[in-house]
């Protein structure tokens, strides 16, 4: 497990029987308004690491400004990189209370910002998913409609083709067959009757010619 991290600009706590306050980083000397007895009663605040970084910066770069304006000293231990951080506030009791109140107000503000951003992202995801669902439904519906139209048009075209074949085939063929049959029958009948009629006509004529001389005598 990694050792607790201390920001480079934070006050080093005085150990029991110990040594005067040592200020690290950007604070090279002790504050004139800070007294060593303030180290005995720190106020402790626990916050999520990401909130501490939002308030004081990732490396604690805003802490010197807060300390100078509030006349307090701040020590931060990051207990768990993904969990909580411990903030110790040293100074006059009234200044401690004001500083802790300010820290908690800033924490609430950043929580609200994160919740708002998460809610906006969630709403955007829902809207995107809804739009995709509607688009898929429209595409499926249009594909089904187009398929129905194609099937209906194919059926109609097939019916027209069948009707045209039936209409053109039956009446024309029947009429042509009937006409041809009538002509053949008439021709045959005429061919068969002509020799008989001619023979009868010749016979009748010879008979008449045979009677005429007698009648004339």
Swiss-Prot record:
GO cellular component terms?
cell cortex; centrosome; chromosome; cytoplasm; cytoplasmic lattice; mitochondrion; nucleus; protein-containing complex
The GO biological-process annotations, alphabetized, read as: actin filament organization; establishment of organelle localization; negative regulation of apoptotic process; positive regulation of dendrite development; positive regulation of double-strand break repair; positive regulation of double-strand break repair via homologous recombination; positive regulation of embryonic development; positive regulation of neurogenesis
Under the heading InterPro entries, the entry gives: KH_dom_type_1_sf (IPR036612), KHDC1 (IPR051778), MOEP19_KH-like (IPR031952)
**Does the keyword section mention Kinase?**
no
Region annotation (Involved in RNA binding) ranges: 1-40
Bias (Basic and acidic residues) ranges:
138-155, 205-217
Q: Which residues form the KH domain?
A: 40-103
* Family that this chain belongs to: Belongs to the KHDC1 family.
Q: Looking at the record, which disorder is this protein connected with?
A: Hydatidiform mole, recurrent, 2: A disorder characterized by excessive trophoblast development that produces a growing mass of tissue inside the uterus at the beginning of a pregnancy. It leads to abnormal pregnancies with no embryo, and cystic degeneration of the chorionic villi.
* Protein name (Swiss-Prot/TrEMBL): KH domain-containing protein 3
Where is the organism placed in the taxonomic lineage, from the top? Eukaryota, Metazoa, Chordata, Craniata, Vertebrata
- The encoding gene is KHDC3L
């Amino acid at each position: 497990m990694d050792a607790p991290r201390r920001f480079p600009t934070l006050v080093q706590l005085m150990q029991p029987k110990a040594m005067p306050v040592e200020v690290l980083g950007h604070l090279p000397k002790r504050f004139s308004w800070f007294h060593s007895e303030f180290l005995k009663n720190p106020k402790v605040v626990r916050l999520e690491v990401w909130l501490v970084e939002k308030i004081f910066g990732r490396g604690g770069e805003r802490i010197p400004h807060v300390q100078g304006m509030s006349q307090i000293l701040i020590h931060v231990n990051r207990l768990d990189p993904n969990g909580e951080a411990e903030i110790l506030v040293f100074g006059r009791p009234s200044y401690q209370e004001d500083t802790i109140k300010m820290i908690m107000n800033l924490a609430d503000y950043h929580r609200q910002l994160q919740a708002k951003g998460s809610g906006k992202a969630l709403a955007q995801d829902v809207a995107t998913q809804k739009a995709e669902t509607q688009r898929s439904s429209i595409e499926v519906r249009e594909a089904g409609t187009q398929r129905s139209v194609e099937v209906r048009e194919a059926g109609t075209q097939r019916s027209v083709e069948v009707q045209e074949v039936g209409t053109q085939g039956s009446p024309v063929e029947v009429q042509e067959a009937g006409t041809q049959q009538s002509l053949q029958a008439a021709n045959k009948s005429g061919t068969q009757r002509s020799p008989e009629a001619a023979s009868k006509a010749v016979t009748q004529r010879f008979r008449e010619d045979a009677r005429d001389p007698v009648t004339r005598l």
